[in-house]
Amino acid sequence: MAAVILPSTAAPSSLFPASQQKGHTQGGELVNELLTSWLRGLVTFEDVAVEFTQEEWALLDPAQRTLYRDVMLENCRNLASLGCRVNKPSLISQLEQDKKVVTEERGILPSTCPDLETLLKAKWLTPKKNVFRKEQSKGVKTERSHRGVKLNECNQCFKVFSTKSNLTQHKRIHTGEKPYDCSQCGKSFSSRSYLTIHKRIHNGEKPYECNHCGKAFSDPSSLRLHLRIHTGEKPYECNQCFHVFRTSCNLKSHKRIHTGENHHECNQCGKAFSTRSSLTGHNSIHTGEKPYECHDCGKTFRKSSYLTQHVRTHTGEKPYECNECGKSFSSSFSLTVHKRIHTGEKPYECSDCGKAFNNLSAVKKHLRTHTGEKPYECNHCGKSFTSNSYLSVHKRIHNRWI
C-alpha cells in the first residue's frame, strides 16, 4: 500500500496559498531555526506519513505516481538535512531504483495536479505509524507493489489475480485439490462458494429469480445465462461459420464440428462424441435408462432437457418467440428451425440428389425415398411407412372400425 510523506520544508510553498507567505520575510531565519530545532527532536519518517488506500492509489495516473515518488524521496532528503536520523524503509530504496528507469514518466508538478494536491491537503497533519499498510478487504490481504502492479501471479500459467485468496483458489485447477466436501453426497469442490451453491441442490433453495418469467435459480450465473433467452443475447461467435451462442461452453462444443474432434467414445458401439454430456445421453440408448420422469403423466426421458421441453406440453409455456412474426415455441431448437423459414436458410443437403432442407429430420425423412427404408410399422396390419406422421395418418383407418 502506498504512502505519501509531505516534505517539511516544501509544504508551505507547494500546498498552501501564496498569500499566506507574503509579509513573512522578517524574522524568517529565526523561524527556520526554531522549526529545525523542533523537527530535529520530534519528527520522524513515520510520524508525518500520509497513506493512500488501495482505491485511492488505483485512481492515480502514472504522472501522479511519479509525483508521489519525487515527494517521497525529497522528504527523505529533507529530514536528513535537518539532522534527523532516517532509517531508509525498503520502499525508499525501491523508489530510488525506479527513478532511474522511469524518468520518461515525469512532467507533472503539484501546481498542475489539483486532484492529487487536494487529496494531500486533506490528509496533511494526519500522523501514521505504519508507512506500509496492508489494507484488508473482507479479511483477505491484498498485495500490491508501490506502483499498483498486481503481485498475485500463478507460477504455472502466469495468470494474475487481485487477491491472494483468488490465486489460491485458482491454483487448485492445476493441483486438482478439492478441500470442500458436501456432507450429504460427498461431492468435493475447490472453493467454499461452489460448495454453498451445490448445497442448494439438496435443500432446494433458489434465491435468484428471473424478473421476466419468475423462474428461480440456485446461483447468479445460471440466472445470467437464462436472461439471455429473454434478451436474445448470444455473445459467443464462431470465427469459422459465424454462428452465435449464448454460452462459451456451447461455442466450444460447436467448434468441434469444424475440427472433427471427438474425444468421448462409446465403449459399446464405438461412436464418438465431442462432449461428455452427449456421450452420457447416448449411453442411455444402450442401457435403456430414462431417469427423468414427468410428475404430471409419468412419462420418462433420457435427458433432463427432454423432460423440460415435455413439461411445457402440460403448462403450455412457449418462452421462445420469433422476433419477425411473433410465433412462440416451447424450445429454442424449434425457434431456430422456424427462423429458417424467414431467412430461407437450408443447411442440410441430400448427398444423393442435392436437394436442401432447413432441418435435419426433414433430410433424414427424404433420404428414405432413396434407400426405401420404412422404419415405422403399423401394429394392426403390418404396413410400413417412411415417417411417423404417415403412420399416424394411416392408423386413423383402423380407429374408425374400433
Curated annotation (Swiss-Prot):
<keyword id="KW-0539">Nucleus</keyword>
<keyword id="KW-0238">DNA-binding</keyword>
<dbReference type="GO" id="GO:0008270">
    <property type="term" value="F:zinc ion binding"/>
</dbReference>
<feature type="zinc finger region" description="C2H2-type 6">
    <location>
        <begin position="292"/>
        <end position="314"/>
    </location>
</feature>
<feature type="domain" description="KRAB">
    <location>
        <begin position="43"/>
        <end position="114"/>
    </location>
</feature>
<protein>
    <recommendedName>
        <fullName>Zinc finger protein 558</fullName>
    </recommendedName>
</protein>
<dbReference type="GO" id="GO:0000977">
    <property type="term" value="F:RNA polymerase II transcription regulatory region sequence-specific DNA binding"/>
</dbReference>
<keyword id="KW-0479">Metal-binding</keyword>
<keyword id="KW-0677">Repeat</keyword>
<keyword id="KW-0804">Transcription</keyword>
<feature type="zinc finger region" description="C2H2-type 2">
    <location>
        <begin position="180"/>
        <end position="202"/>
    </location>
</feature>
<feature type="zinc finger region" description="C2H2-type 5">
    <location>
        <begin position="264"/>
        <end position="286"/>
    </location>
</feature>
<feature type="zinc finger region" description="C2H2-type 7">
    <location>
        <begin position="320"/>
        <end position="342"/>
    </location>
</feature>
<keyword id="KW-0862">Zinc</keyword>
<dbReference type="InterPro" id="IPR036051">
    <property type="entry name" value="KRAB_dom_sf"/>
</dbReference>
<dbReference type="GO" id="GO:0000981">
    <property type="term" value="F:DNA-binding transcription factor activity, RNA polymerase II-specific"/>
</dbReference>
<dbReference type="Pfam" id="PF01352">
    <property type="entry name" value="KRAB"/>
</dbReference>
<keyword id="KW-0863">Zinc-finger</keyword>
<dbReference type="GO" id="GO:0005634">
    <property type="term" value="C:nucleus"/>
</dbReference>
<dbReference type="GO" id="GO:0006357">
    <property type="term" value="P:regulation of transcription by RNA polymerase II"/>
</dbReference>
<dbReference type="InterPro" id="IPR036236">
    <property type="entry name" value="Znf_C2H2_sf"/>
</dbReference>
<feature type="zinc finger region" description="C2H2-type 1">
    <location>
        <begin position="152"/>
        <end position="174"/>
    </location>
</feature>
<comment type="similarity">
    <text>Belongs to the krueppel C2H2-type zinc-finger protein family.</text>
</comment>
<dbReference type="InterPro" id="IPR013087">
    <property type="entry name" value="Znf_C2H2_type"/>
</dbReference>
<dbReference type="InterPro" id="IPR001909">
    <property type="entry name" value="KRAB"/>
</dbReference>
<dbReference type="Pfam" id="PF00096">
    <property type="entry name" value="zf-C2H2"/>
</dbReference>
<dbReference type="Pfam" id="PF13465">
    <property type="entry name" value="zf-H2C2_2"/>
</dbReference>
<feature type="zinc finger region" description="C2H2-type 9">
    <location>
        <begin position="376"/>
        <end position="398"/>
    </location>
</feature>
<feature type="zinc finger region" description="C2H2-type 8">
    <location>
        <begin position="348"/>
        <end position="370"/>
    </location>
</feature>
<dbReference type="Pfam" id="PF13912">
    <property type="entry name" value="zf-C2H2_6"/>
</dbReference>
<feature type="zinc finger region" description="C2H2-type 4">
    <location>
        <begin position="236"/>
        <end position="258"/>
    </location>
</feature>
<keyword id="KW-0805">Transcription regulation</keyword>
<comment type="function">
    <text>May be involved in transcriptional regulation.</text>
</comment>
<feature type="zinc finger region" description="C2H2-type 3">
    <location>
        <begin position="208"/>
        <end position="230"/>
    </location>
</feature>
